[in-house]
Amino acid sequence: MKYQQLENLESGWKWKYLVKKHREGELITRYIEASAAQEAVDVLLSLENEPVLVNGWIDKHMNPELVNRMKQTIRARRKRHFNAEHQHTRKKSIDLEFIVWQRLAGLAQRRGKTLSETIVQLIEDAENKEKYANKMSSLKQDLQALLGKE
């Protein structure tokens, strides 16, 4: 396993995940009967500050259909948590208009690179073009100065 599991922290994430799903109207318990489901949800809500007990609630009451989705969510959250500790692995998001994203994705695909690598390459290309333009301008001025002196 690449990322260390932190039981208390992840139990808090699981609690938040389940509460969010409940508020969105999903069935988070394995019970069909509404009163039994509500009792289990009430118990879960009371466990907010008891992360160790959340895993017990999950084993006993959680809807089996949510198991894989919750595991995926927690795995992604764990990865983001550990990557955020180091500047070089921290991820940032940017908003792009769809057409811009589409063109960038097409360029990345043609170049066989990731979106991030393509953006870095475009920036480097622009910087090199700017350096070249400055150098040519400087050479042009030097040449004009030489020709003007003679």
From Swiss-Prot:
The keyword S-adenosyl-L-methionine does not apply. It is found in: Cytoplasm. Gene3D superfamilies: MatP, N-terminal domain, Met repressor-like. This is Macrodomain Ter protein. Disruption phenotype: Mutants grown in rich medium show severe defects in chromosome segregation and cell division. The gene is matP. Keywords: Cell cycle, Cell division, Cytoplasm, DNA-binding. GO terms for biological process: cell division; chromosome organization; chromosome segregation; protein homotetramerization; regulation of DNA-templated transcription. GO terms for cellular component: cytoplasm; DNA replication termination region. Required for spatial organization of the terminus region of the chromosome (Ter macrodomain) during the cell cycle. Prevents early segregation of duplicated Ter macrodomains during cell division. Binds specifically to matS, which is a 13 bp signature motif repeated within the Ter macrodomain. Homodimer. Belongs to the MatP family. One of its GO terms (molecular function) is sequence-specific DNA binding.
